[in-house]
Amino acid sequence: MPGSAVQDASVNCNQLIDTKGTTMTKNKKSASGLSAPFMAAASGLINGVLSISLLLLFIVFPLICHNSYLDILETKFNFYQKCIVSMLSVMFLLAVILAVIDLMEFKGSHTRHLFSKIVRADKKTPFFAADAAVFIFWVSSALSTLLSPYTKAAFYGNKGRFSGLFLLSLYVISYYLISHFWKPKRWCAELFLASGAIVCIIGITDYFQLDILGFHKLIDVSQIAIFTSTIGNINTYTAYVGLVMGFSAAMFALEDSPLKTIWYYLCLCVSFAAIIMGCSDNAYLSMAALFGGLPFLLFKTRKGIFRYLTITATLFTIIQVIDVANHLFPERVLGLESLFLVIVNFRSLPFVVLFFWGIAAGYGLMSKYFEAAAPVLSGGTKTVRVWAVLMAAGIGVLCFMFFDANVANHADRYGPLQSYLVFSNEWGTNRGYIWRRSLQLYREFPLLQKLFGYGPDTFGLLARGTILEEMVAATGQIFDSAHNAFIQYLLTIGFAGSAGYLAFLIAAMYCMGKNQSGESFIFGALFASACYALQSTVNIDLPIVTPVLWLMLSIGMAGCRFSAPKLICIT
């Protein structure tokens, strides 16, 4: 993609490759007056600023707290916005200084070169699709803010969860800068997993009511079971752990180094334990994204199939270990709920664990003989296609079960699962009610509001102004969010904004999935994003965790651009 500006900013500047394939060493100037040393120096400065910001966001952001859970939303938001605003300020200052130097020393040739590449960006690439979609998302959010009856609240998000236009703008700008100008470094993966493991371990100790941070002393006893670690509400906590789980699973599955494989496996085990002990139903969706999506990457090789079987066996082993701990320390643990409780109560669980480890061990020992006897088991395109058929069949069965339980009124057939299959106002802690009423409110919007919504993060204002009494009477609750990120965006930034956001997620994940560089952190970012995206169908975007999603998308796309062929360095 020789005309792409986003590729231009991602290549090693010790070599400069022009569109004709000619290479200039860093000690020479091109015919157009470009200086490789100047470009390398500029690139180093920009990458230094971005790397420091990533270091703070990957390590400090997940762990920072102030006054227990009482102000955790404000604390995370303030840290994130200060970090990004500081990064933008330094980047702007650098840009001005470099532009002045370029003007004085090189007659502005580098600046003109940069802007010429931006104007001639290749519009046929998946990179451009993601960039265009996120731009539509931002423009729609800006128009939504201007058209909102609560313009100030829509901009700052101070009447909601601080997810107004200001925060959305920080997401988009940081995405553009990191994905376009940051040269990927493998340490970002290690930092993310290290801080993530700490968050998970703290959450695990909270499950055993150790309260090592002392946060539970400052909240009501009735709230102890639903606030944990350095994240807060268990729904938000398991959303974050899902990011760690998806990232570590992909890294473990693709790693060749024995020591790093052990490290990623330990992170995976910790994340499995943490997400199960988090006792939130959105964990099932994160796991569905992980175990449903990994085979499309791993089933191409025998090694990948073996790693997938190992991951599956590990999950059931962790569940079994938690069950044993629950029986050994019944007075210490909070206890499992919902589907995980059904699984641990399954009497044959130990045999399930042994079965999966037996399958994994057997496959590891015998897989080399499958190529002739059973080619579909040795990995490859056919194996992936078989999995795709099984996935389609599984989704079909699930759809039938929903139809059978709701339309055919055969819910009794499904025993403990009927609480998940029967969709009513009470489904998902009254999510059924707020989803239904949210869509009804959207249908009542005038055309302009259907397109651009009520204003970013103004759902609470909308709900209190229209359905407050009905909401309290029906559920006994006051909802300030739709408990579904996509429905939330549909009402607050309209069809245009929510479509732009969804298209951005799909385009970015498609780009990462098609990457052929072999960089495992790109696939780690892909599965972290996929786990988050699926669980957000029962959750909302908050500045406690959502910044990490945008970081995953940013570094994943940066990796894709850096590894793309025929790159042109412009910084």
Feature locations, PLM:
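Alpha-helical transmembrane segments of multi-pass inner-membrane proteins
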Residues: 25-29, 33-67, 85-100, 135-151, ...
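Short, hydrophobic transmembrane alpha-helix segments
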Residues: 65-79
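Short, charged juxtamembrane terminal tails flanking transmembrane helices
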Residues: 565-571
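TM-adjacent membrane-interface loops and short helices in multi-pass inner/ER membrane proteins
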Residues: 233, 425, 429-479, 493-497
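Non-cytosolic membrane-interface motifs at loop->transmembrane helix junctions
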Residues: 76-77, 155-164
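Transmembrane alpha-helix boundary signature
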Residues: 96-123, 144-156
